Amino acid sequence: MKKTLYLKFILAYFIFGVFGFIIVTTFVPNMTKEHLIREKAESLYSEATLIAGTYAGGLYTSETTLETVKMQLDSLAVYLNSEIRIINPSGRLVLDTNSPLDVENVVVIENFDSTVTSGSYYIVGDFFGNFDSDVLTVFAPITSNYKVKGYVVIHTDMNDIQKSCNSLLNISYITLAILFLLSLIILIFFTEIVYIPLRKITHATEQYAAGN
């Protein structure tokens, strides 16, 4: 019976490890990814809001030129490792840091809808079919005389966020492995302090009962 109890204890130890691994691989990836998305979106939205109130806002009050804003946003886009756009409410692309200025050829984003965020300030997707893969997109309105004149839109590749997520997941797996190894101490203590002495006592009792 004591041997059966010990085997059950070992089985419980391995079940703990299996369930810990299942929980980490099932729940942690989505939780980590959502956290990174929200964190990145918040950071980009702060930048977009700043741009809307300074560089981009100056375009609609004739305080600066399109060329000047383009140069400033190009540098900022490199720093943020993102693509920055200024888009009119109609969907007409005013400026794109990934493309040179071309005022003669008007680019319109089909089906552009600034309300797609549904009360939030970011979305994840291909941005109305503009990208081949998913991007994280944040919107910040450009206002003048209490009217929305356009939007500062910042895109960042979801692959970069996924890479960060994978790095954090590797840390989670390593942490789980360390906890599993540390919990082995409990098994060792149980074996040395409880199981082995109990087995010796049981053996001695059996020998005494047998007249030895």
Sequence positions of predicted segments:
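Membrane-proximal alpha-helical signal-transduction linkers
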Residues: 193-212
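Extracytoplasmic/periplasmic sensor domains and loops in membrane signaling proteins
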Residues: 70, 94-133
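Juxtamembrane segments flanking the first transmembrane helix
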Residues: 1-105, 163
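Transmembrane alpha-helix boundary/anchor motif
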Residues: 23-27, 31, 156, 185, ...
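Helix-start (N-cap) segments at beta->loop->alpha junctions
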Residues: 59, 143-145, 153-173
